[in-house]
């Protein structure tokens, strides 16, 4: 066991997570079509403050993230402060760590709490895959800049004459890694091949995710942590996530064709997480501040770790790298955990990480550790389903996982929970949570 790094303030206070909330998650171009991420963020933070009954002036900092950023609102965090009636002097800034963005937001607020610069803050994230920053071609962009500098009409017309029809076509946001040109699904296909993960295994995990998420909603386990969203034209509110396939059968998954490697692939739309709209946030405080306000925390942040690996091959192995580090810093092992929640970007990615967490060879030869991190107990793993079922608004997923895991830990009488995710750029995140 390496160095334990307790997450406490100088006064010995633990970092308390007192409340968490999210919007329902909606598939791209469905219930939240036309609603930008900044409005989803305002929606969830406003409702979170109202439900918690914590005076807005108690919140001293808001750290929020957005992966698909809109040029007109580059600092989503500040817009949320200004749009929710919070104190105008509340510090607010935005972060982005791809699919681990709200993990980063939580870590940043925790660091401010430990430094003593604040006693309470909000962390979270929002994304919309339905309201996208559609750009222009590089040639058109350059001409538009030059036209702005031109002094005469003839100069402007000459510049425009350089353009061809193809230069006028809109440019959607990139879906591939900037440094490699690989799409996420291409990486998932790499991982399926590298680690011998079959189509049947991927479909089975996806089916499990949907079945468990549907059961969680049916049992009323998500009611406290998911708000009702009222959206224009206000005829029908959105109450639940709309991606979950509660009535599907395992045989249905086999009917879909591969989405990335059309000829030899195993990754399909059904065993991958869909493009999704939504927002999620949590309130963090020092333990003593929560007591002052008479609040009973959902739980505590015990440790966290962020890692990075090469992007060319199997780059979605973040959980296999960050989990041992987070456990080490928490002074725990896999066997100490009550729950494990891993982000399901793709079934192939999820199964590869599970495989490597239990691999002695990977631990020795790649991580330089004496022993494997530990086998993943299926009875503890993604017990309420995962991102394949719920969906994945990039910046909101971490906050969803944290809130969901803490509520489930409390239902089970407390214990330790691990939440972990891969992210674009070869990044990984893991956090250990504790509930009493």
UniProtKB/Swiss-Prot annotation:
Its UniProt entry gives the catalysed reaction(s) as: an acyl-CoA + acetyl-CoA = a 3-oxoacyl-CoA + CoA
Q: Mind listing the UniProt keywords for this protein, alphabetically?
A: Acyltransferase, Cytoplasm, Fatty acid metabolism, Lipid degradation, Lipid metabolism, Transferase
UniProt-annotated catalytic positions: 99 (acyl-thioester intermediate), 392 (proton acceptor), 422 (proton acceptor)
Which Gene Ontology molecular function entries are recorded, alphabetically? acetyl-CoA C-acyltransferase activity
GO cellular component terms, alphabetically, are: cytosol
Subcellular localization, as worded in the UniProt entry: Cytoplasm
User: What PROSITE patterns has UniProt attached to this entry?
Assistant: THIOLASE_1, THIOLASE_2, THIOLASE_3
Pathway this chain belongs to: Lipid metabolism; fatty acid beta-oxidation
Transmembrane helix among the record's keywords?
Answer: no
Q: Which domain of life is it from?
A: Bacteria
* Xref: InterPro entries: Ac-CoA_C-AcTrfase_FadI, Thiolase, Thiolase-like, Thiolase_acyl_enz_int_AS, Thiolase_AS, Thiolase_C, Thiolase_CS, Thiolase_N
Q: Is Cell membrane found in the keyword set? A: no
Which Enzyme Commission numbers does its entry carry?
2.3.1.16
Task: Please cite one Gene Ontology biological process associated with this protein.
Answer: fatty acid beta-oxidation
Family label:
Belongs to the thiolase-like superfamily. Thiolase family.
Description of how the protein assembles with itself and partners: Heterotetramer of two alpha chains (FadJ) and two beta chains (FadI).
Question: What does the protein in this record do?
Answer: Catalyzes the final step of fatty acid oxidation in which acetyl-CoA is released and the CoA ester of a fatty acid two carbons shorter is formed.
| NCBIfam families assigned | AcCoA-C-Actrans (TIGR01930), FadI (TIGR02446), PRK08963.1 (NF006516)
Q: What is this protein called?
A: 3-ketoacyl-CoA thiolase
């Amino acid at each position: 066991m390496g160095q334990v790094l307790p997450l406490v303030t100088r006064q010995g206070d633990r970092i308390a997570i007192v409340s968490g909330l999210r919007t329902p998650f909606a598939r791209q171009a469905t219930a939240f079509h036309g609603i930008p991420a900044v409005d989803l963020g305002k929606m969830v933070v406003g409702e979170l403050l109202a439900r918690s009954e914590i005076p807005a002036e108690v919140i001293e900092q808001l750290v929020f993230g957005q992966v698909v950023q809109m040029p007109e609102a580059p600092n989503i965090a500040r817009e949320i402060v200004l749009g929710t009636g919070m104190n105008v002097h509340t510090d607010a800034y935005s972060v982005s760590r791809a699919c681990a963005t709200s993990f980063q937001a939580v870590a940043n607020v925790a660091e401010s709490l430990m430094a003593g610069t604040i006693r309470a803050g909000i962390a979270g994230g929002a994304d919309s895959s339905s309201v996208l920053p559609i750009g222009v071609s590089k040639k058109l962009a350059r001409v538009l800049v030059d036209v702005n500098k031109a002094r005469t009409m003839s100069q402007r017309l000459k510049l425009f004459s350089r353009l061809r029809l193809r230069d006028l076509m809109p440019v959607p946001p990139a879906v591939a890694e900037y440094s490699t040109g690989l799409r996420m699904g291409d990486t998932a296909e790499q991982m399926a091949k590298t680690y011998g993960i079959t189509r049947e295994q991927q479909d089975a995990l996806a089916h499990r995710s949907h079945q468990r998420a549907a059961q969680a909603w049916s049992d009323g386990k998500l009611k406290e942590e998911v708000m009702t969203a009222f959206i224009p034209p206000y005829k029908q509110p959105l109450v639940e996530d709309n991606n979950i396939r509660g009535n599907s059968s395992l045989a249905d998954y086999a009917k879909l064709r591969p989405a990335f490697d059309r000829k030899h692939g195993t990754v399909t739309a059904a065993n991958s997480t869909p493009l999704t709209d939504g927002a999620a946030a949590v309130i963090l405080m020092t333990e003593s501040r929560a007591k002052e306000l008479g609040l009973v925390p959902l739980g505590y942040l015990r440790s966290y770790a962020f890692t990075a690996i090469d992007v060319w091959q199997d780059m979605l192995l973040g959980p296999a790298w960050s989990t041992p580090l987070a456990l080490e810093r928490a002074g725990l092992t896999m066997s100490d955990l009550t729950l494990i929640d891993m982000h399901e970007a793709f079934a192939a990615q999820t199964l590869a990480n599970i495989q490597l967490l239990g691999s002695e060879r990977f631990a020795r030869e790649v991580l330089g550790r004496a022993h494997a991190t530990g086998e993943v107990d299926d009875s503890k793993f993604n017990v309420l389903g995962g991102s394949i079922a719920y969906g994945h608004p990039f910046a909101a997923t971490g906050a969803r996982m944290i809130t969901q895991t803490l509520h489930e830990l409390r239902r089970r009488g407390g214990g330790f929970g691990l939440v972990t995710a891969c992210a674009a750029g070869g990044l990984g995140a893991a956090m250990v949570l504790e509930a009493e």
